Amino acid sequence: MHIKPEEITSIIKNEIKNYEKELETVDSGTIIQIGDGVARVYGLEECMEGELLEFPNQVFGMALNLEQDNVGCVLLGSEEGIKEGDIVKRTGKIVEVPVGEDLIGRVVNSLGQPIDGKGPIKNDGYRAIEVPAPGILERSSVNEPLQTGIKAIDSMIPIGRGQRELIIGDRQTGKTAIAIDTIINQKGKDVICIYVAIGQKQSTVANIVNTLTEEGAMDYSIVVTASASESAPLQYIAPYSGCTMGEYFMNKGKHVLIIYDDLSKHAVAYRTMSLLIRRPPGREAYPGDVFYIHSRLLERAAKLSKENGGGSLTALPIIETLAGDVTAYIPTNVISITDGQIFLETELFNAGQRPAVNPGISVSRVGGNAQIKAMKQVSGTLRLELAQYRELASFAQFGSDLDKDTQARLEKGKRLIEILKQDQYKPMAVEKQIMIIYAAVNNFLLDIKVSDIKKFEKEFLEYMDTHHREIGKAILDKKVLDDELKSALESAIVEFKKIFLM
C-alpha cells in the first residue's frame, strides 16, 4: 500500500485541528501534621468550612478551621497509612448522607453506610447533613398529640408532633427506656422513628435493635449509630445525619420521631475535636459555639404548615446529668433550646417508681395544645394533687395525729402514684390511660388496697375490653368526656369494683 507524503501531512493537520486539550485542575494541599484523627493541611486556599476533603486510601475528612496558612480538618475514617507530605484534594461538596424509604428497618453508621450485614441500601439520592431549619412561615403550631404510651407523660407532660422534649436524668434512671417505649407505641400510627446512638457501647445498641425487632418496631424505624469505639468526628456528625434522614420523610408530609441518645456524649465528642484542632476552650473546656451545635440541630424539628405538606419531625434529645445537677453547662443549654423537659430522679427510681418522672420540675411548654380534651379533663388536677401529696407525705413523717382531710389526701396520693407506675415495653393506649386515671382521680380507688392497685388496673382494663369496648371507642371518636360518657364509665367502674371486691 502506497501513501503519498501530502496525504500524511493533511491527516496530521486534521488531527491537530480537531485536538482539544483538556486540563483537569484539582485544588490540592499537603498534609503538614496528622494525628489523633486530626490533620493540618497547607494550601487549599479556596476551601469552604465544613467541606469534604479527599485524603489518600479513600479516606475523607471535613474542614473545620480555615486559618491564614493552613486548614484544620477532622478525619471521617482511619488515619492508618496517611502521613505528612501526602496530597489532600478538595471535593467541592459538603458532607452528605443517603436518604430514602429503603433505610427503614436498617442499622447504619454516621455516613449512612449499612452495618447490619443485610447488604447495600438503595437510596433516593444524597442530602447535606447541615441544612437551615424551616423558617417561621413554613411552620404551623404544634397541635397533634404524639402519644408515648406512658401514663405519667401523656397525662402530665404531653408531647405534640413537631415538639422538642428533653429527657434528662442521671445514668441508670430509665431515659433510654422511655425513648424505646415511645418508639414501640408508634406501631400502626404511621410515624417513622429514628434512633441515633451517640457514643454508646455496641452491646447496648445491639440490645436496643433486638428489642425493637422483637416488638415489631424495626418495620418503621432506622437506627443510626456512632459507637464509643468510633472517632469523635463520626460521633459528632451522627445526629445531623439522622436528622437529614428524618427531614426527607418530613418534607414528604410524613410524621417522624427522632431520638438523640445522648447529646452529652455528642458535646464531649465536639469538645475533643475542638481541642485537637486548637480552638480556644471556654466553660468546662467546651468551645464557645457548643450551644450553637445543639440549637441548629434541634431547631430542625418542626411541624410544617399545610402548604408545605404538613409533615412533622419530633425530637426527643437525651441528656445525662451528674448527681442530678441540671445547672451544669450542657444541661442548661439544652433545657433552654427545647420546649420542655422530662426529669427523671434516681431517688424515685430506687423507690420503685418507674418511670421515675418528677412531675414537679418536668414541664411541656407546647404539648398542652396537642393533648386530647378527654385527657385534659381527667389529668387537670393530677400534677397538683401529686405535688400536695409529696408535701404532705414529708410532713406526715413527723406527726402521727393527722386530720381526716390530710389522711384522705395521703391515701389518694398513694393510689395516684401506684396508677402512674408502668412496666417497661408495655405502652398503653390513650383511651385505657384515660379510663384508669379517671377512676383514680375521682376517688373510686380509695377502698382498694394500695398493694392491689396494679392487679385492679390490669383486671379492670381487661374487663372494659370484654364488656364495655364501646366506651373506649367513644373516647377515641369524641375525644372528649361528655356527661353521657362519664356516667357510662362511672357505672362500669362501680360494676367492676363489686366483682373485684367479692
Curated annotation (Swiss-Prot):
EC number: 7.1.2.2
Cited InterPro entries: ATP_synth_asu-like_sf (IPR023366), ATP_synth_asu_C (IPR000793), ATP_synth_asu_C_sf (IPR038376), ATP_synth_F1_a_nt-bd_dom (IPR033732), ATP_synth_F1_asu (IPR005294), ATPase_a/bsu_AS (IPR020003), ATPase_F1/V1/A1_a/bsu_N (IPR004100), ATPase_F1/V1/A1_a/bsu_N_sf (IPR036121)
Keywords associated with the record: ATP synthesis, ATP-binding, Cell membrane, CF(1), Hydrogen ion transport, Ion transport, Membrane, Nucleotide-binding, Translocase, Transport
Keyword Metal-binding assigned: no
Molecular function terms from GO: ADP binding; ATP binding; proton-transporting ATP synthase activity, rotational mechanism
Root EC class: translocase
Gene3D superfamilies (UniProt xref): 2.40.30.20, ATP synthase alpha/beta chain, C-terminal domain (1.20.150.20), P-loop containing nucleotide triphosphate hydrolases (3.40.50.300)
Compartments, record wording: Cell membrane
SUPFAM superfamilies: C-terminal domain of alpha and beta subunits of F1 ATP synthase (SSF47917), N-terminal domain of alpha and beta subunits of F1 ATP synthase (SSF50615), P-loop containing nucleoside triphosphate hydrolases (SSF52540)
Binding-site residues, ATP: G169, D170, R171, Q172, T173, G174, K175, T176
Cellular component GO terms held in the UniProt record: plasma membrane; proton-transporting ATP synthase complex
Site (Required for activity): S362
Superkingdom of origin: Bacteria
Record-linked Pfam families: ATP-synt_ab, ATP-synt_ab_C, ATP-synt_ab_N
Transmembrane segments: none
Membrane topology label: Peripheral membrane protein
Main location: membrane
Catalytic reaction equation(s): ATP + H2O + 4 H(+)(in) = ADP + phosphate + 5 H(+)(out)
Quaternary structure and interacting proteins, as annotated: F-type ATPases have 2 components, CF(1) - the catalytic core - and CF(0) - the membrane proton channel. CF(1) has five subunits: alpha(3), beta(3), gamma(1), delta(1), epsilon(1). CF(0) has three main subunits: a(1), b(2) and c(9-12). The alpha and beta chains form an alternating ring which encloses part of the gamma chain. CF(1) is attached to CF(0) by a central stalk formed by the gamma and epsilon chains, while a peripheral stalk is formed by the delta and b chains.
Family according to the record: Belongs to the ATPase alpha/beta chains family.
UniProt function note: Produces ATP from ADP in the presence of a proton gradient across the membrane. The alpha chain is a regulatory subunit.
Name under which the protein is recorded: ATP synthase subunit alpha
